[in-house]
């Protein structure tokens, strides 16, 4: 039935982009003033670069380009096929912190302001806190292993010390994973108790947690670029004083992209449209239980979103 639809009813065999469909698709008429770029795993982990028009709100006319691979040369060689007039119409492009995406945006859309997605910036800070937690957990596991070996050598049974909430040290560190991603006001009662114990035992994790939350507050509270710049400068100072290596790496990444990060405060634009479109592609793929014929899958995708 599907073969019948594919070969006779769909118009797929007469598609003007069939020859290069697996490598790239372009829909120049869909370019708008506000666009976003991201990558998606189409099938079997094969990455494609997707360019979408925000003003289409995930419906028809959303897809501008879908290109196999994320290499700068490959992607730009396709996007430069778009007319210069159209490319210079783009006023803003949102993207993540990947250097290849930044290069693609700069080469293909030179007149557009680049905006680094706020969620990718905040994610760096959250991951820095998690790195501190994981390091502490490994240390706790090593300590427990040493204590077990010592007890065994003495012919005794080892009993791990338990905190007031019933967690052992390694359980405390393992079970704190989710609360460190959340605002303090969103903790449940049990998470609040666990956080209190965690922060008492590991003051560095407490400092790291509040550093990550303060970065989020800059995005939430600041409405103007100059105020955001001042607040970010203060945040850098706090990171320097903390001496945390994990946050030092975060601060350096932010400094590298700070011009694109600060552009967020003009229109508060995020890459949510790209993430949403990627989710639609994955849902469409799941509906057909995977991708057997990649070119035909892209044809159907184009019919819906291009």
Where are each of the predicted segments found?
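RNase H-like nuclease fold core
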Residues: 3-94, 99-104
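A short hydrophobic/aromatic micro-motif that marks alpha-helical segments and, especially, helix-coil
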Residues: 12, 53, 135, 290-291
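Short secondary-structure boundary/capping segments
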Residues: 8, 51-52, 107-113, 129-134
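Short alpha-helix plus adjacent loop in nuclease-associated cores
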Residues: 121-142
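Acidic/histidine-rich catalytic cores and adjacent linkers
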Residues: 44-46, 54-60, 76-81, 85-111, ...
């Amino acid at each position: 039935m599907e073969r019948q639809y594919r070969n006779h009813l769909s118009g797929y065999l007469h598609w003007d982009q069939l020859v290069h469909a697996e490598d790239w698709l372009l829909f120049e008429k869909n370019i708008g003033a506000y666009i976003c770029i991201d990558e998606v795993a189409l099938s079997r982990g094969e990455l494609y670069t997707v360019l979408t028009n925000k003003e289409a709100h995930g419906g028809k006319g959303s897809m501008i380009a879908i290109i196999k691979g994320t290499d700068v040369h490959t992607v730009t060689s396709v996007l430069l096929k778009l007319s210069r007039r159209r490319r210079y119409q783009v006023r803003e492009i949102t993207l993540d912190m990947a250097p290849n995406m930044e290069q693609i945006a700069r080469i293909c859309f030179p007149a557009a302001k680049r905006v680094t997605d706020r969620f990718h910036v905040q994610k760096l800070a959250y991951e820095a806190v998690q790195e501190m937690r994981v390091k502490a957990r490994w240390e706790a596991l090593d300590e427990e292993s040493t204590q077990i070996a010592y007890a065994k050598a003495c012919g005794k049974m080892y009993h791990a010390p338990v905190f007031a909430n019933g967690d052992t040290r390694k359980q405390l560190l393992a079970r704190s994973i989710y609360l460190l991603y959340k605002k303090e006001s969103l903790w449940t009662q049990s998470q609040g108790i666990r956080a209190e114990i965690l922060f008492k035992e590991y003051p560095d994790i407490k400092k790291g947690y509040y550093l990550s939350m303060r970065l989020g507050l800059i995005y939430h509270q600041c409405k103007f670029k100059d105020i955001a710049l001042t607040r970010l400068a203060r945040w850098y100072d706090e990171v320097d004083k903390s001496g945390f290596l994990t946050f030092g790496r975060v601060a350096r990444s932010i400094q590298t992209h700070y011009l694109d990060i600060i552009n967020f405060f003009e229109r508060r634009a995020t890459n949510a449209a790209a993430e949403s479109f990627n989710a639609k592609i994955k849902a469409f793929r799941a509906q057909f239980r995977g991708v057997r014929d990649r070119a035909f899958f892209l044809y159907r995708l184009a019919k819906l979103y291009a």
